[in-house]
Regions:
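N-terminal intrinsically disordered, low-complexity, charge/repeat-rich segments that act as generic
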Residues: 1-69
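Serine/threonine-rich low-complexity intrinsically disordered regions
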Residues: 2, 8, 20-23, 27, ...
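Residues that cap or delimit alpha-helices
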Residues: 20, 76-78
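Mixed-charge, Lys/Arg-rich low-complexity intrinsically disordered regions
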Residues: 28-30, 78-119
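Basic/aromatic-rich interaction segments and small domains that mediate binding to polyanionic partners
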Residues: 34, 49-76, 125-182
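Intrinsically disordered, low-complexity, charged/polar segments
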Residues: 87-92, 97, 148-218
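Amphipathic, soluble alpha/beta structural segments
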Residues: 112-116, 136-139, 204-213
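Short boundary/loop segments of OB/S1/cold-shock single-stranded nucleic-acid-binding domains
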Residues: 119-125
Length: 218
């Protein structure tokens, strides 16, 4: 994890209300684990969205994580330390982990979608074309001009952009695995950090995934 990302996350966490210094320390440690294991972060948040009672991560070496999803609260436990957050604050916390710490895949990357999470009509569309659930990414963190951004825009692989099909708006949660990463260099890394992370935090932009969850909670 790059130092500038952790500094940005610390600034984001300071925006959250009613967090003690100890709470922030625990939540930072949890965030480092989640960002280092995107599959765990993904499974953890999907369980939350599905109103499951909890999610448990028990690694061989690292600290175990336990999430308990209650009606109005979320309890997060790491070893013997526990933080309790209102559901709305947990959503805000998750959005900052995603914004500041999650990997932003390069343009041109080919990813596989998780068909179990896709809308039925999209699954049928892929199947009718006899396509694998592969997508090539052509846009990242696209500002929707409503205070939110969509994680990725892409097109079905291997066809790419076609005039007879609309682009796909994709959430990080839909990504099952990365098949092939696109080209990246220091210019791309600088853009991701300074614009897609820092400028978005300054502008108050969050992923539409968490905006939708906020709407559902009201």
């Amino acid at each position: 994890m790059k130092e500038e990302q952790m500094i940005l996350f610390a600034r984001a966490l300071s925006i959250c209300n009613n967090l003690s210094e100890k709470d922030q320390e625990v939540l930072t440690a949890v965030a480092m684990t989640l960002s280092g294991h995107p599959d765990v972060f993904r499974a953890c948040y999907i369980a939350f969205m599905n109103d499951e009672p909890g999610y448990h991560y028990q690694p061989m070496i690292e600290a175990p994580l336990e999430f308990f999803y209650e009606k109005e609260l979320v309890r997060i436990r790491r070893f013997q330390e526990e933080v309790t957050l209102p559901r709305s604050l947990f959503i805000q916390y998750a959005s900052y982990v995603d914004l500041c710490l999650s990997r932003i895949y390069p343009l041109g990357s080919v990813i596989e979608l998780d068909r179990e999470l896709l809308p039925k009509d999209l699954v049928e569309s892929f199947e009718s074309e006899q396509m694998d659930f592969f997508v090539v990414l052509s846009g990242r963190r696209v500002d929707l001009a409503n205070g939110h951004y969509v994680d990725y825009i892409g097109h079905g692989y291997p066809f790419g952009l076609r005039f007879d099909t609309s682009p796909l708006f994709l959430s990080n949660l839909f990504i099952k695995r990365v098949v092939s990463e696109g080209y990246s260099d220091t210019v791309d890394e600088h853009y991701c950090q300074e614009v897609l992370r820092k400028d978005y935090l300054d502008a108050g932009l969050i992923s539409s995934v968490y905006a939708e969850e906020e709407v559902n909670e009201d």
